[in-house]
Amino acid sequence: GPADGQAVVVLLDTFGRWFVPENGEALIDVLAAAGCRVHVAGADDKRPLCCGRTFLAAGLIDEARHEARRLLLALKPFIEQKIPLVGLEPACILTLRDEYDVLLPASETKGLADMTFLLEEYLVKQSDVLSIRLEPTQYKQAALHCHCHQKAFATDHDVETVLNWIPELTVNPIASSCCGMAGDFGQWAKNYDVSMAMGELSLLPAVRALDPNTVVVGGGTSCRQQIHDGTGRDAVHFVQLLYQSMAHSAATRTGETGHS
């Protein structure tokens, strides 16, 4: 991004880093295109940072606390300068806002919660100062399913707001509860029947009934995996639609017909 742009630090979550790296790349590109000066959080020991959520979900509190402290050490210079932390994965990012205050002493987490945002929250909060130029994409209809953490923290409305910025795109939230995957819950053989039954309550039938040209937007990695496994439809993070819309916009402004 521009040297005089608003500084942000991106946290690439473990799931995104290894399974869908294109989402992290799109996040960086979208923020840079919006006029931000983007930093990527990293540790001195070169091992990728992790919020510790997977350890926490498994009851491994000491391991989760160790990862949390590694992350906070890397973020400390940014927190001290009040530089916002932005990420994509709801369970990971909102763990920093919610569980860290219980996991660690307040002296270690001071300032963290106030400077930590999911992408949708950050874009809505800063919409008056960011340079967000969007053009129509190939999609006219989007069906939206948000992660349970997004619903719990009411960021699902921000996702809908941001998607509605894309011209000629109609956004239809899917009336659904948990997809059933719930982190790694649905990955366990003993939970399979319960996991699929949860998905079949509303989400999976709704996705199967969609027009093939409707893009399915899923808020979390586990949500998108459950949708794929349960329906055969691929779901995308909304950052991909923003990236496409911004890329089209950039191409339009420069007279190009595409982008690399």
What are these regions (language model features)?
Residues 1-260:
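Iron-sulfur cluster-binding electron-transfer modules in prokaryotic oxidoreductases
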